[in-house]
C-alpha cells in the first residue's frame, strides 16, 4: 500500500509542476487522477478492500465541502439582475434534462420502475465545471458563456439533490425495500424540509455573526477559513441530528452564508482555488481506485448507450430548449448544451444513495454513474480546449457579421 501512496503523491507533485502547460492541452486534472487511481488499483499496489471505507468517507467530506463552497460563491441578487441564461438553464434546463433523460432511460431499461428511470436521469443531470476547466477559463470564449456555465454547475448539484432524494424514496416504496412505505415517503420529505430549514438558519446567522465580528475587529482573517469549514461540518451534522439531510443543509447554508457576507469572506474563493483543488483531485483518485474497476467490469451496451445519449442528446436538447427566446445564437445553445460534463456530484450522489437508500437497485445506479463520469471525463476533457478555441473564433466571426448586417440595414 505504501508504494501505491508514493505513486499517488509523486503524481500530484508532477501534475502541479506541469499544470499550466497541461491546461492548454487535452489532458485535464480529472482525467489524470481518475486514471492514476485506476492504474494503481489494477497494478495491485492498493486493493479495493483497503479503499472501501475510505471511498465513503472522502465522498461524504468532499460532497459536503464542495456543495457549501459552490453555493457560497453564487450572488443571488446579481444572478437576478444580470444575464438570464444560467437561470433559464437551471429552472427550465435542469427539469427538462431529468424529464427527457427519464424518457430515454425507458428505451434502454424498460424493465425498471419509472421512479428508478427518473432517479438515474436526475443523478446524471448535475454538471461539473472542473471537467471543462479549459472552457470556463478560456478567454477566447465570451464572458457571458463562461459565467453561465460556471453559475449553472455551481447550483445545479444542490438543486438536483432534493429531486434525487424524492425519487430514491419512491424507488424504496415501489421495490418494497422498506417495510412501511408511507413512513419512508414522510422521511424523504422531512429530510428535504429540515435540511433546507437548518441550512438557511445556520448559514444566515453565521454570516451575520461573521460580519459583526469583522466590524468590531474581534476576529482575524487568519482564522476565517477554520470558521467556514467548521460551519460546513456543523450545518451537515446539525441537520442530520434533527432528522434532515446534511447535504441539502450544507448547500443551503453555503447559499445563505455567501449572500450574507457578500464577498467579505475571501477564504471561500481562496480555498476553492487551492485546497479545494486537492480535495477534487483526491476524490477522482478515490473514484478511480475504489469504484472504476467494478464499474468497467459491469459496463454493458445499454448502460454505455444511455450514457452517450445523455451526453450528446439529453442535456444539449434540454439546454437548447431552455435558451429559446433569448439572444443566444444557435451555435451558443449547442455549445453550452454539450459542455455539461458529469463529474463529482454524479459519482458522489450515486455512491451515497446506493449505500444508504436504494437496496437492490443501488448497484445499477452506481455502475451507470461511475461509467458516466469516466466517459464524460474523456469526452469533455479531450474536447474542452480545442472546442473552446474553435467556438471563440467562430462566435467572434458571427458577431462581426451580425454587426455589419446591422450597419447595412441602418444605411438603408
Give the ranges of each region predicted by the language model:
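Transmembrane helical cores of multi-pass secondary ion antiporters/exchangers
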Residues: 1-412
